[in-house]
Amino acid sequence: LGDVYKRQAQLWAAEAHEYVFFIRTGHLDEETFRAYNDALLEEGLSRVEPKKDHMYTYVSVVFLAESIAPEVPKLIKKTRCHRDYRMSLYGWMDYRIAAYDCTSKRIYTNWAGRPLKQTLLSVTKKRRKHK
């Protein structure tokens, strides 16, 4: 009948990952923030697997607190971690932080965490409508 040839080619591939950690606490002070921040950044970095098809990984931390100490929003805003792997050929990683103050209904983020603010706003608006 003849020969059958099969050719497979992968033209394009990209892996994108996000690891989200939720922390619920009564009062978020500087000491608590730093302890969680250090531990979760280390944990998130350990999960990143830079390789040929890796495009990006987001490590996101969301704090849900009854109250937030006045110095913590400044710490959140100043906290940054961005890693490029092999000049971005093996992708990159961003560390995103958001904190929601349940008492004042305020949301604080670092620069990379700005998209989290929109998500938290939409979730809290829906929650307020259902009460």
What are these regions (language model features)?
Residues 16-19, 56-59, 95:
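Short, surface-exposed beta-edge/turn micro-motifs
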Residues 78-131:
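Charged, structured surface patches that assemble and position nucleic-acid processing machinery
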